[in-house]
Amino acid sequence: MTDIHAQRILILDFGSQYTQLIARRVREIGVYCEIRAFDMTAEELAEFAPKGIILSGGPESVTAAQTPRAPQAVFEAGIPVLGICYGMQTMAEQLGGKVIAGEKHEFGYARVEKAEPNALLDGIVDHEEQGKEFLDVWMSHGDRVGEMPAGFVATATTGSCPIAGMANDEKRFYGIQFHPEVTHTLQGGRLLERFIRELCECEALWTPSNIISDAIDTIREQVGTDEVILGLSGGVDSSVVAALLHKAIGDQLTCVFVDNGLLRHQEGDQVMEMFADNMGVKVIRVDAEDNFLGKLAGEADPEKKRKIIGNTFIDIFDDEASKLQNANWLAQGTIYPDVIESAASKTGKAHVIKSHHNVGGLPEDMKLKLVEPLRELFKDEVRKIGLELGLPYDMVYRHPFPGPGLGVRILGEVKKEYADTLRLADHIFIEELRAAGLYHKTSQAFAVFLPVKSVGVVGDARRYEYVVALRAVETIDFMTARWAHLPYDFLELVSSRIINEIPGISRVTYDISSKPPATIEWE
């Protein structure tokens, strides 16, 4: 069996907003990687045994005291190192060069001129003019390298940043001031592939079929002959987990589909048809609407709502597991960004933005052990795994749906009346997006219930009824997103249908906030 983790890249995180994007680009090249904090110890580094190391960007200034530095072991390991933006600057400083505060900051598109030949950039070019080669790149920096360490040559330059790239081919140390991980750097993919496949000499072992084979072996070794219980929601992550576990352990898997009253339109019937009827998976359907709504009654705080929903799910799983003779494991659809975002990152000094349903709301006294076969994967990788396992395209590429469901799309207190109203509004919005061919042109779209009343007119009568907001965004990575510029006539159609077909709604609004500063979900 191929060890798909053997040839791997280590990404040391200095707090960049793009760090996860670096990891996704490495995975796309077919090589496993992990993100670790910048202050990894020499022992941890040796144990991880990477084939190469990438130093991420970051918001700090190398010129300030007490700012993050890479472990010295990084430069003593005898393996290739690529420093990106801040990573290049700390590499230069730590190896004897100098970093200075730039007189002119560079943010956004830039054209860099290639300079000295080197193994990283040779043959990679966007434009040639008068015998010179140029790259179109994305910059985001204030400081710059003013003096390179001994043994380095300048590989790229701009008018305001004379050393926009540097290289020491003998030691295989490379620094670039721009960001190859973002799509605005047109040759970024080629550059990263050059570093990983050629300079680090990594094979492309991280493929969907290999990941599935490895996951099956790991699952079988982990759970043995025990039974596994999985909370099946119908979302992408839990659906892929169900298909993967069913392939690995067959009837040892029992899925519990909890109808909590906070699901999408007809979602329960669709889940049962797909998994129980078509795939032969054992699925127990639990009607728990009254249970959930009872516990949520009177609670308006979003974080508390998430915790209530998470804990209630676990209580139900525990109860169902107690009915199964051998059930010792709870399977979850936790994915890699869940793990990263739910950790209080010391590199970015980040607050936990939201407690993820999968990893942030589990009680300490939970009786079941966890099995999380997607924990190493990004969302795009999960989708590829789903297709490889034979799940339908429309299910695999369905828009994301939060674990707490409509509970975090109803602002404030959750009531059955609100959930029923929102479910119908959301259904109309999604139905019309599909009919107009716009569903897959948006990354995520949904309706939000606002617990405020607005005046409306029906016939000659005034009425005060609720407001629904529509939200649709376009994004590549869900870390940043822009609001989707849907046609006005389309929005008019959706608004008209919602107001005319759903009792209790008098007004429909469209959310035109981007992320940041807003988040995609309202709670």
From Swiss-Prot:
HAMAP family assigned to the protein according to its UniProt record, in alphabetical order: GMP_synthase
Principal EC category: ligase
Q: Which GO terms describe its molecular function?
A: ATP binding; GMP synthase activity
Supply the name of the protein. Answer: GMP synthase [glutamine-hydrolyzing]
Q: How does it assemble?
A: Homodimer.
Q: Which InterPro entries match?
A: Class_I_gatase-like (IPR029062), GATASE (IPR017926), GMP_synth_C (IPR001674), GMP_synth_GATase (IPR004739), GMP_synthase (IPR022955), GMPS_ATP_PPase_dom (IPR025777), NAD/GMP_synthase (IPR022310), Rossmann-like_a/b/a_fold (IPR014729)
- Function summary: Catalyzes the synthesis of GMP from XMP.
Catalytic function, reaction form: XMP + L-glutamine + ATP + H2O = GMP + L-glutamate + AMP + diphosphate + 2 H(+)
Active site as annotated:
85 (nucleophile), 179, 181
Q: Does the keyword Nucleotide-binding apply?
A: yes
Residues binding ATP: 233-239
Spell out the Gene3D superfamilies in the cross-references: 3.30.300.10, 3.40.50.880, HUPs (3.40.50.620)
GMPS ATP-PPase domain boundaries: 206-398
Q: Tell me which UniProt keywords the record has, alphabetically.
A: ATP-binding, Glutamine amidotransferase, GMP biosynthesis, Ligase, Nucleotide-binding, Purine biosynthesis
Q: Which Pfam families match?
A: GATase, GMP_synt_C, NAD_synthase
User: What are its E.C. numbers?
Assistant: 6.3.5.2
Residues in Glutamine amidotransferase type-1 domain copies = 8-205
Which Gene Ontology terms of cellular component type are present?
Answer: cytosol
The lineage, from the top, is: Bacteria, Pseudomonadati, Pseudomonadota, Gammaproteobacteria, Oceanospirillales
The pathway this protein participates in, as annotated, is: Purine metabolism; GMP biosynthesis; GMP from XMP (L-Gln route): step 1/1
